[in-house]
Amino acid sequence: MEMAYIQAENLKHKRTFTKTLIVLAPFVTALMNFFAPLWFQFNSYNWWYILLYPGFLTLTCALIEQRDNGKLKYRAVASLPVSQNKVWKAKIGVAGIYSCVGNFIFLALNLLGGFAILVINEIPLTIGIWQAAAGTACIVIASLWEVPLCLWLSKKVGIFVTVILNAGLGSVLGIFTATTSLWMICPYSWVPHLMISVLGILPNGEPVADRSAAMSFWMILLVLVISLVWFAVLSCLTAKLFEKKEVG
């Protein structure tokens, strides 16, 4: 039953800018850095998780939410004999899937670009295949909690303010706290902090000089588990609030 809701939600975005954005954002990121071959992989990842991906994720969630929250303000959905709780969770599921697909495309472009540079310029890969895959997985999981948050923000304050708050202020806050002792209590810093250990990239784009201070595997796993728990909490909370508002 839940899969039917997800399929229905996905169909709403057929031939829309939301689907285009899934491909456009990774391609723009790769293209912006391809002409600096020596640092292509490092710069691409840094630009992706610091700037392009937060914008992509936020805008994707906002566009998904606004698809039903236009002139009708969910009245069309509320009139249907469906579970409003599941309708909202389907939006979360579709946004999460789009995030995964966008990150997978970025991973493929980063590695293809790295191999192309190896062949053309004889510059070896600075980030290996498994390291890149691990880094991409960390980006997806550690940012997953933003999906229900962005959907709810979009419902309450609209696209523009949501982008400013999440992709703007949130990202800036994450950058400034990622290298401090406050990183664990600031969810926005989880991705940039993980990238220090997993990919060896500082938030300012410079490579990590001393890898001896890198987090252990279990510490990285703990952060990812906390992110998943936070995602589950926000998903259930926003779904309940949505159901109460639309049904009540």
Question: What feature does the model see in each segment?
Answer:
Residues 1-50, 56, 210-248:
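Hydrophobic alpha-helical transmembrane segments
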Residues 12, 77-79, 154:
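Helix-capping/transition residues at the boundaries of transmembrane alpha-helices
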Residues 25-29, 94, 166-173:
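Transmembrane alpha-helical core residues of multi-pass small-molecule transporters
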Residues 27-52, 56-57, 93-159, 213-220:
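Secretory targeting signals
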Residues 39-40, 163, 168-244:
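Terminal transmembrane helical anchor/hairpin motif
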Residues 64-97:
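Helix-loop-helix units of permease transmembrane domains in multi-pass membrane transporters
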Residues 69, 73, 109, 113-122, ...:
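Membrane-interfacial segments
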